[in-house]
Amino acid sequence: MSHITIANDELRKQFQYYERFGLHVANGNSFGLGAAQAAYEHGEDWYQALLSYLKENLDYLDGALKARVPQVKLVYPEATYIPILDMQALGMEPEALKHFVWDEVGAALNAGTTFGPGGERFMRINVATQRKNLELFIEKLARALEARK
């Protein structure tokens, strides 16, 4: 279940148009509605544990980068679990960086260029994952950079 706010009048009209045709984009099912209610009424402990876990993963990633790959800097997110990796110090052009991360490191990160001008040489990484995935990423990134020397 999710919530949507559409400030743009034209986009809201388009959304409402499609909604009328029964695409069920605005209607939750009984399981989803019950789960959402339970989460709002009884989910505070789980939510706080999740926030703690995400913070621990961010801190792990930051420390591991500083220790193993200091030329890559973590930019802590302001409100999400998807921080930005500042990879400018690697000296790669944006397309080369994307292919390096995707093909040589083997990580499906979001290229910063996807998000507009200024995103060159930056990548987004999702830390809402198991710690072992972040450990594997650090290991593969360090090895791929070492192989390029």
What does each model-identified segment do?
Residues 1-149:
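PLP-dependent class I/II
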